[in-house]
């Protein structure tokens, strides 16, 4: 009876949690680690693929990569088989781990969230492969975020510089082309005039030939 009532309470809490936080991954990305703190982070094995993550990354990983399996598994923290959503169980029953994990500060989403993901996926800072060498335009609304983070500006600036360099090269090349086109206009008009005169002569010759042919035919018939 006690276990059934506990399961009912946990299931009810899970539903309330899902209604309150529709996107849990975004919620976890809403915290940034304070720079300069490199203390040991406790890691837990994913109960579905055995990869190791810290507590926040584990919840994001389960929520994104194992959404269908998350309702039946063994909790990596307390080693108890859970019959409800695993992420909800961890966040509700082991909330103290989140507090002890690290001091964190709330932040807004946007480019900072994207930067955190890029840092996790590309720890060596090689972000250029994401853009495939294509040009990138940085909007004015995100310029303050770029300036605030030197790592973000380090990989956006070369791309933006390449874009403006290419644009300047194109404008420099189109200038002489326009001048050449303007210079060629009189020559083209002269060619058109000469061609029209030749066409007129050809038409006159053809009309004379037709008249001669008709006149000869009429004369032959009269004879």
From Swiss-Prot:
Superkingdom of this protein's organism: Eukaryota
Keyword Phosphoprotein: yes
Localization annotation: Nucleus
InterPro entries membership: DI19, Di19_C, Di19_Zn-bd
Entries under Pfam families matching the protein: Di19_C, zf-Di19
Keywords: Nucleus, Phosphoprotein
Modified residues (Phosphothreonine): 114
Tissue spec. comment: Expressed in seedlings, roots, leaves, stems, flowers and siliques.
PTM info: Phosphorylated in vitro by CPK3 or CPK11.
Gene Ontology CC: nucleus
Coiled coil: none
Molecular function, one GO term: DNA binding
UniProt family annotation: Belongs to the Di19 family.
Name assigned to this protein: Protein DEHYDRATION-INDUCED 19 homolog 3
Species name: Arabidopsis thaliana
Phylogenetic placement of the source organism: Eukaryota, Viridiplantae, Streptophyta, Embryophyta, Tracheophyta
Gene: DI19-3
